[in-house]
Structure formats: C-alpha cells, structure tokens
Amino acid sequence: MLSSTDLVQAVTADLGKIRETAPLVLSLTNSVVQPLTANLLLAIGAVPAMLNDAEEAVDMLRSGTGALLVNLGTVTREQGAAMQTAVREANRLNIPWVLDPVAVGALSLRTRLAGQLKEQSPRIIRGNASEIMALAGYSSVTKGPESTSSSADALHAARELALHTGAAVLVTGRTDYSTDGRQVTATENGHAMMSRVTGVGCSMGALSAACAAVSPTPLQAAVSTAVLMGIAGEMAFEQSPSPGSFAVSLLDSLYALSPEDVVRRARFLSL
Amino acid sequence: MLSSTDLVQAVTADLGKIRETAPLVLSLTNSVVQPLTANLLLAIGAVPAMLNDAEEAVDMLRSGTGALLVNLGTVTREQGAAMQTAVREANRLNIPWVLDPVAVGALSLRTRLAGQLKEQSPRIIRGNASEIMALAGYSSVTKGPESTSSSADALHAARELALHTGAAVLVTGRTDYSTDGRQVTATENGHAMMSRVTGVGCSMGALSAACAAVSPTPLQAAVSTAVLMGIAGEMAFEQSPSPGSFAVSLLDSLYALSPEDVVRRARFLSL
Amino acid sequence: MLSSTDLVQAVTADLGKIRETAPLVLSLTNSVVQPLTANLLLAIGAVPAMLNDAEEAVDMLRSGTGALLVNLGTVTREQGAAMQTAVREANRLNIPWVLDPVAVGALSLRTRLAGQLKEQSPRIIRGNASEIMALAGYSSVTKGPESTSSSADALHAARELALHTGAAVLVTGRTDYSTDGRQVTATENGHAMMSRVTGVGCSMGALSAACAAVSPTPLQAAVSTAVLMGIAGEMAFEQSPSPGSFAVSLLDSLYALSPEDVVRRARFLSL
C-alpha cells in the first residue's frame, strides 16, 4: 500500500506523462457528452477520437490508440455491436479499455451488454454507487443517471466486482473509492457542482482511459483520475460557483492544473 | 382566468416544485441540442435522462420518469419508431409528454410523424410560429429551423391545435403565447439573443416537460416555461451580451433564478 | 492574383454578405461538433440546419439552402448514403457544397467514401495537412483527428487535388493555404489554442460553406474562412487564454468581428 506522499507523486507522474505523450483515447461514448469528453481530454493534454463504425474502430485501434473508452449512456444495438468488436480488438492488441456502465440496472439493453462486457477484461470500471452495485449483481435504486446510493454503500460490491473481473473499479461520489479488490484508496477531492453539469461523470471515464494509457497500474490510473478531476472541480468552483460557468472553468482548470496543485490539494482518506 | 398576481404565484410555485422534487425528464431529442438541454434541466433543478433504444425508453418510463419530451429536430425512421413506443407507454402510465415539432412543414419525415403524434394526447406542444401553423395545417414559410412568421400570426392556429389535440400550445417568439384553446396567456419575457444560441428553443420544450411534471395544468406549465426561460434570458443578456458567453450565463441564470426575480420581471400582456 | 488590399476587401465583403443575407447552411456533420458548429454559424450571422434523414436532406436543399457541408467525422454507412443523396441533389440545384474529410487515410469507411465524394464536384475541400495529403493519394501519418504534417508539406498535394476535383482546397494549420490549383493564397491568422478545442477545424468547414453561399468564387470563400476564423481565434485568445473560456470567446469574437478587425489583423504571406 502506497503512502499518501507516494500516491501524490504517482498522480503527478501520470499527469506529466499524459501531457508529454498525448495519448490517443478512442471514446465510444454517448452523444450527450461527446463535446465535453473531447474538450476535457484536449484540456488535460490527451488526444480524443470518436467514431461510430465498427470497422473504423478497429482501424483506429491499430493506428496508435493508447486506450479505449466504452460508455453505454445512449447505447443502441448497433453501437453495442461496434463496442464488442472494438473491445475484442483492444484486448488482442493489449490496449487498455475502460467500461463506464451508465445507468445499468433498470435499463435492459445496456444491462445485458454490460454483463457481457465486464467479462472481457476491462482494465477499469468507472461508475457511481448505483451502477457499480447493479453491475456487481446487487439491486440498487437509480433515478435516471443519478445515483441514490452513496459510494461507501458500494464499496463491498466494488471489491467483489474488481476481484471477479480483474479490473480496477472506480466508484465516484462524494468520496471516490479506487480498488483492485485487495487494496482500496479513498479520495475526497471534488465538489457537488460537478453533478450539476452533464457529462462530468462520463468524462471521468474518459480521463481514466487517458490515465490507463500512461499509468503503471489500472489501480493507480483510477486514483489519478479521481484526484485530478476532483481537484479541477474544486479549482473551478472557486472561480465559478454557477453551473454554466463552472463547466467552462473545469476545462480551464484541467488545462492549468500543476503538480503543485496536486501536492497542495490531494486528499487521501485512511480506511 | 388568473390575474397577473395569481400567474406569478403559480410560476414561482412551479419553480419551487421543480427544485424540491427534481423530476426526471426523459428527453428523446435531437443530437445538436442534447448537451444544452441536459445542462439546462440540471441548472433549473430537474434530472435529465437521454437514450436511443425503444425498449430502454419503456424501462425508463417505468422507473420514475416525471415527464417525456419528444423533439423531432434530427429524427430518423428508427428514432421515430422509438418515439412512438415511448409515447404509447407514457400515455399508458399517465406520464405527461411534450411534442416539439422542430421544422415541421417543409421536411417530410418529421411532418408525417408529427401529424401522427399530435393525435396521441400530448400535454404540451411547443413550437415557433411557423411550426405551430404547419402542425395546425396552415401553410407557412420556414427558413430551416427559424420561423419567418410572428407568434401573433400563429395564435389562431395555436388555439385550433389546442382544441383539436387537447394539449396546451406554447408558441414562442418575441411574445410567447400559451393557450389551451379557450384561455390565452401572452408573456413578454426573453431577449433576441436567445435565437443566436442553438438549442434554446428546444430547451424550452424540455423545460416545459419539467414544468408539466409538477404543474397543476398543462396550460400553467406552458406559461411557467415561457416566463422562467424568458427571465433567465434577460438576466443572461445583462451579464453577457455576446452569444458564446450568453449561453453560459443562461445556465447560470436558471440556476440562480429566485422567486423575487420572477415577481420583479414577469411581464404578462392583456389580450 | 489579388493584392492584399483587394483580398482584405473581399473578406470583409463576404462577412458583410453573410450577415446581410443569413445563408442557410445544411450541415451533415459529426455528432461531436454539432453544437459548436451550429453556434458558430449563428454567431457569424448564418442559419444552421442539421438533420439525419436522406429524404429530409433533399427537402431542405429544395427549401432555400445556401450551401451544404459534408463532414465525415463520425460517419456510418447510413449517414454516408444520406450524404451521397444530398450531394447529388445539391449538384442538381447548383448549391455549393463543402467536403471535410476528417481523419481520412487510416479509417476505411470514410476513406472509401471521401474517394467517391471528391469526384462529385465539391466547391471547397477543407482539411488539415494529413487529410489533404491522404485525399490526394499521398500517404501521411495521422494521429487520430490530429495532423502530424505541416500545411506547407501538403501544399503540393492540395494543388493537385484542386486541379483534379475543380474544388478550392483549404489546408488549415499554422499557416492556412487556399488554392484552386493555379493560385495559392497563404494566410497566417489564428492561434494554437484553436487546436485545444474540439470542433474548431470542423467549424471552419461549416464557415467555408457559409462563405461559399455568398462569395464570388470558391477560392475567395476559402481565403475568407481562413482569415475570419483565424482573426476570431486571435481575438479570443487575447480575452481568454485557457481552452474552456477560449471556446466561449471564439463565438463572442465571431459575433463581434468588424471589418476594421479584418483590415487591422489579416496577414497574407507572399509566396
């Protein structure tokens, strides 16, 4: 288990490597959050790619893609098939991929699809408490894309899910939990305003893919995601405490985020 | 017929109920305006949900959805079929639904579809003058999504459409008209800059769905929509008189909008 | 060959005509950039229309459309077929159309499609260096949607492509090159921050369509596009040097852009 100081160093190292290597992140994601996701990846220093065609997804994976994001937010049968194709190719090429199981549980198509995808070796699974509980097989009440459970409620499910799938699981909420099933890192960066902007959660999935492209382990990538996005959210709220301008400042903050900001602001909890 | 004072109280009551109950609004809407629509619903205090699959739309309607928006802006045959399924289920569950017939008249697929949907008991129909006239069966010249008629021109058509469909009709323009076919409420909040940001009109459709989830009548929901969005537009323009920053301030204004703002700014016309 | 003074006058004339005539630009474009594209067209004074259905594209072209944009960024087989239909109708009606071959080269579906579309008389082809080289038949290394070649590298390919297709070719980069195969105009407006916001390049394709609707020649429309967007980018960076707020200021700057700004800032290179 890393100390807080080691964790902070690992987060700043991931940030530095994203900016230095500009990993290409192929995001098969929902149409609502495509603009924010692409802009957020650009702001942190990664290169976003988005497309719909399965054959082209394979082409892109073979052309220097650093990580793949699969987000089920507005999935259709056709997009689901493209995701399956992309995941197989990513695994064949040993490209890390992230599963973001938006609103699984109540919605049938994505729940079936997520149940299949979780068996195909995602490196990271990112969700709120309700989504992680549903994906782990526990029932949970959701209200649309919003979670009604706390992330602490989901920690047991997250550990089971991590052990079952081999993925690092990132449960986002007031406290963010990152676990590979054995170790758990709890972090408390972020601001409630992040839930008043559409796509911030989904963009954490994309950021975790960028981190997975450069980080030594999926667990570290999950922790870096929670800390970097959380700190950017805090900085954004200090600049802009209303949701429209907050979303703008969130991008500005990710662009400006320095290693010193990480050292000063990262908050790890003892468990 | 309510007095202006009663109307203002009813608008502030709707605003309070949206913030208190956070209704889930399922928006089957066009891809151009999805981000603004979702952010606007979050800013006012509602919870947005968006998806593409017909089966999932039914699942979502059965999971606590407060209102459904059907917006035809980028409709395809496949999305049209999902909309038909969703509307049937909403009616079965007595969930209010809103029809936003973007650019009907010149465009064949959506004109046929809107003609069918208007017969299926929408609670609110929201459109600009050209769209309402076309949907009511009058010819009207449109220029893409922009209206070339004034909302006053469309008032007769709006009353007929309301009587025929049983919906409250909201005609948006410099003056906004809300009618159930018998009563008409004319309001004059808003700013011309709202037409320089894509999706503001479509977001009024989404806001009217949020209002329909909490308001005592569809007519009141239409009036509340016109007043709340119009006032937010005025406040936004005072902060930010250029279109990029205006769009940001529009979200900030909806978030900040107080009952006092409504009392001070609501402008009802005598007809 | 026009002098710099003549070129500046021609650019300001195009800007004036867009604002005066508000051309309707039908954009068949990728889902990531739809909101920015629509907002950018509105900011400069054009009217955006977006839709997915092939039959409706034909309807719209017959209803006063000034120019058509075909952008391959998230193309599917179905959207590709709609694009083919729209291009045929645009040519039949003598409506200028723009091809934006996003990320052609590595990705198979769009590369095949772009190869067909370039033979169908686009008035303007807009791309970065890698895209123009790939479309002209030269191999080039791309990293997702980003170009790894400089626009100067692509100038030879651009001239060949222009002569072969009859289109004006606009190669965007640090220096922007506009050519009809015989004349070349090089312009140096813009700012590197434009590449940190998703959709700025794609929005140049849309702006070039708006210019093509009003400009005396496709070549002039390409030059006007490069200069107007570049100047707006410079003005935006002076206001907002971080990417989130830069994107907002870019729209504000296009809205505010005056003929005097063009005269003062336009930078033409001698070749």
Curated annotation (Swiss-Prot), chains A, B, C:
Substrate binds at residues 50, 199. ATP binds at residues 126, 172. It comes from Akkermansia muciniphila (strain ATCC BAA-835 / DSM 22959 / JCM 33894 / BCRC 81048 / CCUG 64013 / CIP 107961 / Muc). Its EC number is 2.7.1.50. One of its GO terms (molecular function) is hydroxyethylthiazole kinase activity. Catalyzes the phosphorylation of the hydroxyl group of 4-methyl-5-beta-hydroxyethylthiazole (THZ). Pathway: Cofactor biosynthesis; thiamine diphosphate biosynthesis; 4-methyl-5-(2-phosphoethyl)-thiazole from 5-(2-hydroxyethyl)-4-methylthiazole: step 1/1. The keyword Kinase applies. Belongs to the Thz kinase family. NCBIfam families: PRK09355.1. It catalyses: 5-(2-hydroxyethyl)-4-methylthiazole + ATP = 4-methyl-5-(2-phosphooxyethyl)-thiazole + ADP + H(+). It comes from the Bacteria. SUPFAM superfamilies: Ribokinase-like (SSF53613). Keywords: ATP-binding, Kinase, Magnesium, Metal-binding, Nucleotide-binding, Thiamine biosynthesis, Transferase. GO terms for biological process: thiamine biosynthetic process; thiamine diphosphate biosynthetic process. Its cofactor is Mg(2+). The gene is thiM. It is an enzyme of class 2 (transferase). This is Hydroxyethylthiazole kinase.
